Design a protein with these regions (language model features):
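Short, solvent-exposed loop/turn segments in extracellular or other extracytoplasmic domains
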Residues: 473-478, 567-575
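Beta-strand-rich modules
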Residues: 576-598
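Aromatic, loop-rich ligand-recognition surfaces of beta-strand-rich domains
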Residues: 383-465, 477-547, 558, 591
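Extracellular fibronectin type III
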Residues: 504-505, 509, 592-606
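Beta-rich carbohydrate-recognition and catalytic domains
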Residues: 1-222, 234-239, 244-281, 296, ...
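Short glycine/proline-centered coil/turn motifs in the loop regions
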Residues: 46, 315, 545-547, 581
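Extracellular low-complexity, O-glycosylation-prone stalks/linkers
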Residues: 455, 547-570
Length: 606
């Protein structure tokens, strides 16, 4: 059986209700740690109230863990001496370690209380010694220390391993497309302080306004990258210490890696960096994750993808092929990384492919809808941008959305992406919320309910059902429907939409996949690629290819290492900002449309 999946992963992402200056109801799953334990994949993610588990990386089930601190960010799980060790983040008080010999059947129990940390990562070396890494600031390095495997208590002193270096590594620069925001004005600082002070729950110990202003200026006003999300992988005797930056709300949120000969370094920056990045396409970002091997020995990287519209921490999970080349370079294949791809049956044979398993057919398809709110027109469901969406005027069952692909295609799959559109705060939610000085938050561990009817047609008159969820009790906000073979379709329609909290129907992507029978676009051969004076950007501009829907810009430090990519739609230029100052780059601009992908000519920029 072909097992085909599509990012973001098709999970029942949990909602939370949050008040921290602003109020928001949104879904969040982030900072994933994946562990293959006793033949089963365990995936722990932030703000979910438990973990997902799977036998095959294809079908996932959820297991609640009320015994764990579910409101603590960045849960880490690793196997230590045959048991699963769990830790998560607390910045201002000592953190606990928890252990279970069988997380599906045996609750976790606390084994020790250690010290405050954020974004933890545990690693047991081949000799049985255990090391611990942590850090999540724009002012301090990633830290490492040896710990006792029995008590999890520190052995010796912590070591600063590395920090941010945005003056050398362009991808670490904060901001959308690595363009940092200008410094905040005194008025903006005062407004942030006022909002924060007003959000402190009654009775909570509060800092003075002067202390709060100082903290905000120190952490938020310097535009330095957040260096965070450590994770250690050992391969062929080398230690690969991974980290995330520059900020989870940015499309350029990525994972980089330093390499060393010992668990606590010294570490050297890998020239190919970031090794996991996805700044373009439908849903951006591929940072703060973990690296693991599947049952066949294939390497994978699972990480955080971003929406960040309703709230900065509105995030999802992505899974990407990963490997180490003959030189020991760690890299991912993230070409068309939000298109469907096949899970390998045994050893992977297509690690370096530039061709997706299926092609997108719905980009800029002609839309029609029952109604639409101002600024949320139906074309937003086909613009390949998860941050924009169609929203109906009412939450009635009579609302619908339809796409016309323009001609009949052999369709293999549909990904139906729902958005959370201006959900009002539920009444009396605060009574069950977890309260702190910074915020009030309530995780809804039980899934909500998402219902719809998906239909297809060749002529727009005679319709047949593709998926009927009108009576479902599931909650898949990024539902991926892969057909057994293909079906001929020109029109796709979603109706009878019922979303959680009685929200109005909203769709960020009605994405249709297959492959056309026509001609792929011509190759891109003429590319201008001046490099900026500070050498941190390459300003790419190319001659458009006739009939292209978009371009996949591949780049890397050698002609046989075009490991990074940036997918763009509707334009023929790109400010390539995720490069290292000291490196030269090989670049190819591949063109694509409904009929396929054509590789571009490789150029070199010194």
């Amino acid at each position: 059986m072909n097992k085909i999946i599509c990012n973001p992963l098709n999970l029942e992402y949990r909602y939370q209700i949050k008040k921290s200056g602003k109020e928001a109801v949104f879904r969040e799953a982030a900072d994933p740690t994946m562990l293959l334990f006793k033949g089963r994949y365990l995936m722990f993610v932030s703000m979910s109230g438990g973990f997902w588990h799977s036998d095959d990386l294809y079908s996932w089930e959820f297991h609640e863990t009320p015994e764990l601190p579910i409101y603590d960010y960045a849960p880490d799980v690793r196997e230590v001496n045959g048991k699963v060790v769990f830790s998560a983040s607390k910045r201002d008080e000592p953190c606990s370690f928890f252990v279970s010999g069988d997380p599906l059947n045996e609750p976790f129990t606390a084994v020790s209380v250690t010290f405050p940390f954020w974004d933890p990562a545990t690693f047991q070396d081949d000799d049985g010694r255990v090391y611990f890494y942590w850090g999540c600031t724009n002012t301090e390095p990633i830290w490492g220390i040896e710990i006792d495997p029995a008590t999890m208590q520190p052995i010796g002193e912590k070591v600063g391993l590395f920090g941010g270096n945005e003056d050398k590594y362009g991808w670490e620069r904060k901001g959308e497309n690595n363009k940092g925001a200008p410094p905040r004005s005194d008025a903006e600082i005062e407004m942030m302080v006022t909002h924060f002070m007003a959000s402190i729950p009654p009775g909570a110990e509060a800092p003075s306004k002067e202390e709060m202003a100082k903290t905000i200026r120190h952490h938020l006003d310097n535009n330095r990258p957040y260096i965070e999300g450590a994770y250690m992988t050992k391969h062929n005797g080398k230690y690969y210490l991974q980290y995330a930056g520059p900020g989870t709300e940015c499309n350029v949120y990525s994972d980089g890696v330093y390499v060393g000969d010992a668990p606590l370094g010294p570490f050297t920056y890998q020239e190919h960096n970031p090794f996991s990045s996805k700044p373009g396409g439908f849903i951006p970002a591929a940072g703060h994750g973990s690296t693991f091997q599947d049952k066949a020995g294939n390497w994978w990287h699972v990480s955080t993808m971003g929406i960040s519209v309703n709230e900065n921490f509105e995030r999802r999970i992505g899974l990407f092929p990963c490997d180490f080349d003959g030189d020991g370079t760690m890299y991912c294949n993230q070409n068309f990384a939000d298109y469907p791809f096949r899970l390998p049956d045994g050893k992977r044979g297509d690690m370096d492919t530039t061709q997706p398993a299926m092609i997108l057919l719905s980009y800029n398809a002609k839309p029609e809808a029952s109604s639409a709110q101002d600024g949320y027109a139906s074309d937003k469901a086909a613009d390949e941008n998860v941050r924009t969406w169609w929203a109906a005027e009412t939450n009635g069952k009579g609302e619908w959305l339809k796409l016309d692909l323009g001609e009949v295609f052999e369709v293999n799959a549909v990904q139906l992406n729902f958005a959370d559109h201006k959900i009002p705060m539920p009444e009396n939610w605060e009574k069950d919320a977890k309260k702190s000085m910074m915020e009030q938050r309530l995780i809804l561990v039980k899934p909500q309910r998402t219902r719809f009817l998906l239909e297809g047609s060749e002529d727009g008159t005679n319709w047949h059902i593709l998926k009927d969820c009108r009576n479902a009790d599931t909650d898949f906000s990024h539902d991926f429907i892969c057909f057994d073979g293909s079906t001929k379709l020109r029109f796709i329609k979603v109706s009878h939409i019922e979303l959680p909290f009685n929200a109005v129907p909203a769709v960020s992507g009605l994405r249709v996949f297959g492959k056309g029978a026509g001609t792929a676009p011509a190759a891109v051969t003429e590319v201008d690629a001046p490099r900026t004076e500070e050498r941190m950007n390459i300003l790419l501009k190319w001659k458009p290819s006739a009939n292209a829907d978009g371009y996949n810009v591949r780049y890397g430090i050698a002609e046989d290492k075009l490991y990074s990519s940036w997918q763009v739609y509707g334009k023929s230029e790109l400010d390539l900002s995720m490069i290292g100052k000291a490196s030269g780059y090989y670049i190819a601009v591949d063109s694509f449309n409904r009929n396929g992908v054509t590789e571009g000519k490789v150029i070199f920029v010194s």
